[in-house]
From Swiss-Prot:
Function, as annotated: Protein S19 forms a complex with S13 that binds strongly to the 16S ribosomal RNA.
Pfam family membership, one: Ribosomal_S19
Subcellular location: Plastid, Chloroplast
InterPro entries assigned: Ribosomal_uS19 (IPR002222), Ribosomal_uS19_bac-type (IPR005732), Ribosomal_uS19_CS (IPR020934), Ribosomal_uS19_SF (IPR023575)
A GO biological process held by the record: ribosomal small subunit assembly
Keywords: Chloroplast, Plastid, Ribonucleoprotein, Ribosomal protein, RNA-binding, rRNA-binding
Cellular component, GO annotation: chloroplast; mitochondrial small ribosomal subunit
A GO MF label: rRNA binding
Record protein name field: Small ribosomal subunit protein uS19c
HAMAP family documented for this protein: Ribosomal_uS19
Family: Belongs to the universal ribosomal protein uS19 family.
Length: 92
């Protein structure tokens, strides 16, 4: 279910402050965050945000097509190991 249009999109306060500081200084540096639930807003465009995937921080460059999506969508948490084998030689 999507968020109500009456509410503003969720963005973590510390992440929002970091982006506003970089925008006022007109600097570009990697922003490290654990907030995967934050929504990408237009002020984030052009920044590189390192999103935590549970093990490490993955750098993601924010473009205009990402606006409205969550940060966690761009940092996968699971690695696919392959389907289970049914062959008898792979069993013990």
């Amino acid at each position: 279910m999507s968020r109500s249009l009456k509410k503003n999109p969720f963005v973590a306060n510390n992440l929002l402050l970091k982006i506003h500081k970089l925008n006022t200084r007109e600097e570009k540096e990697i922003i490290v965050t654990w907030s995967r639930a934050s929504t990408i807003i237009p002020t984030m465009i052009g920044h590189t945000i390192a999103i935590h995937n549970g093990k490490e921080h993955l750098p993601v460059y924010v473009t205009d097509r990402m606006v409205g999506h969550k940060l966690g969508e761009f940092a996968p948490t699971l690695t696919f190991q392959g389907h289970a084998r049914n062959d008898s030689k792979f069993r013990r």
